[in-house]
Amino acid sequence: MRRTAAVAAGAALLFSAGVAAPAVAVPTGTPVQIVAHTSFDSEVADFESSLEGCESGTVVNGDNAQAHFTPWGGVFSGDKEFTCDGGLSGFTLRLMARFGEGGSTGTWTVVGGWGDLEGLKGSGSLVGIPVSDVAIDDIFTGSVR
């Protein structure tokens, strides 16, 4: 009797494993590149992007943006608010970056979107390349969905 119960329990376990729900894949993102032409002389910068429907516009620092200077350069933390041409949609990236004479590196995450970009999600990395003494091209690469 015990052997019959054990076989039945084993068969039930195998059967339940065979009918388990299939794994659901995490949605894949769409590659994105955003280039912000940042000038230290202006609060507003122009940008271009590969984001459909938001190929260009302007970007400003959010209210929580802070730069902390150190002997080796500094750290930027806070939001970058991107407004697409026309002003009807845009998105906000939260950026953590280190910077110095040679440029900057960091990571970013989408924290919000509005208009046609409401619900936007994504993340990636940043490389900043100095183009003059007062300007840098911030290149954001990653994926969005």
Q: Model-found features: residue ranges?
A:
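C-terminal region of N-terminal signal peptides and the immediate post-cleavage residues
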Residues: 4-7, 15-33
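Beta-strand-enriched cores of mature, soluble protein domains
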Residues: 24-145
